[in-house]
Amino acid sequence: MSSVFTVKIVGPAGAGIKSGGLLLSRILLSHGQHLIDYSEYPSLVRGGHNTYQVSFSHQPVSSIHYQLSLLISLEPNHWQLHKTELTKKSLVFGPDAPLVLPLSDLVKPIGGHIYANTVALGVIAYCFGFDPSICHSEIINTFSLDSPNLTAFDAGFQYAQNNFIQYQDIFKIHSNAPVKRALIVDGSEAFGHGFLVGGGNFYAAYPMTPSTGLLHFLAQKQLTHPITVLHPEDEISSASLAVGAAFAGARAAVGTSGGGFALMNETVSFCGVANLGVVFYLASRPGPATGLPTWTAQGDLLHAVFSGHGEFNKIVLTPGTHAESYQAAIEALNLAARFDVPVIVLTDKLLAESSASFTPPTYIPKVVSSPRHLPGSDDSFYMANSYEHDQNGFSIEDASLVKKVVTARLSLSKKIVKYLPKPVFYGSDQAKTLILTWGSTKMAVLEALNMLDNPSKIGLLHFPSLWPINPNWALMFKPFKNILVIENNATSQLSTLLASAFPFKPTSTLLNCDGRPIYPEQIVKYLKPYVS
């Protein structure tokens, strides 16, 4: 396995933790590094404890790591919260850290503590052997040619040069040429790119962490793309606007998180009976209720699958990476148009708000549409009725006719299954143990498999879609002695869902419910009995 480095910047909200971190990611990309980053923050505007961390390598890296190469604290009393993440080789900088960095003194002549994050970047650049000219270029691109941030970066670099010479290039990176067309996008932005490429032209949302990034991204794109983006007064209005847009012929989507999606459930049901294809971007966070608004979890799988009252068709997609988020947007729009059903794209805070190096595909995707008459057509009309209705949209109550309509509607699921993205297997044909996972946990599992001394004994099966379930999935488990389920919730909702479709009981599960991601180091430790 190639060397993967992990840097973490910590401090209070308002100290520029994320802005400094994103600048670091751009510097890494310019050095030809593959990366994935992630921020954690409380529900506070100022104070508290915020973090930004990035894991990177000259070869592809799938997940953030738990163990740190370098930790840098912008204020006192912060680095101590991360002692369990340190190793004997970790470097720790800060005002009260083992390697003292007097940020207050360094930023005083520059303009104050607002520049502490860029001073920190200078120290990081020194330890990793970054090219200062490349760092200067990224700072200029982010700020301006005469930005004090240039002075701040040089102050940090020079201080490290004068005081930490023993750590010069200690983590020397293997520089590559920058990847052409590579972007740094978070999961919501990746979905947004796919939404635009897939012909999406209407989006409505009421801000709710962690889905808000998609609203911000698409709102900016109104200036350059034929898309309407609305921010109404609440989640019910958002969903209703998307339904109206779909009725009028738009390729429409709405975004929210768990609590907002709970309010939208009647709209999901309406789409199911009125044959309206709307995409729901559901970025989950820990519940119940307000829960942990700025943390991550995979606790909404069953909520998504069984959303809406009554029995009707819906589709649930569960992308696991930034590239899959891009693809899921295109697939969701096409599936919604092909089958005229609600499509839920289920992600979480980890994927929605982590950023990764990503190169958009150059191909133009096929845009699927369903032939139907739109409101205002001269020769006909279409009624979208929330009552049970016949094929012309007229309400019905006759027992035999109702049974016929319901049976015909539900039979569509057999056709839908054929168009869904299939489970993807990673690993050796010799594997005797199979890991099942869905959504963002795929990233940590892939990274863990890359860290194992004997990965040939373990396989991974990732589900990029989970509803409708294909009963034939059960056949994929038969060759394996052990079936393990890894997901970021307390009750193993994937196990519950699979057991509802066919006999299923995993050998073991690795679950998490503290609002933090599952890290590859945890998975490696968990897998030890299965690789020995």
Where are the language model's segments positioned?
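Thiamine diphosphate
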Residues: M1-A15, L22, G32, N141-F306, ...
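Anionic-ligand anchoring segments at beta-strand to alpha-helix junctions in alpha/beta enzyme folds, i.e.
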Residues: S2-Q67, G198-E233, L436-M443, A448-L452, ...
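ADP-ribose/adenylate-binding Rossmann-like module
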Residues: H82-L99
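Flexible, low-complexity linker and terminal segments
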Residues: A177, I184-G198, A328, L333-S532
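Conserved thiamine diphosphate
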Residues: L71-S73, G122, W295-P342, V531
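Short alpha-helices
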Residues: D96-N141, N489, Q493
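Cofactor-/ligand-binding subdomain signature composed of acidic, glycine-rich
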Residues: Y115-L121, P132-I173, S369-I396
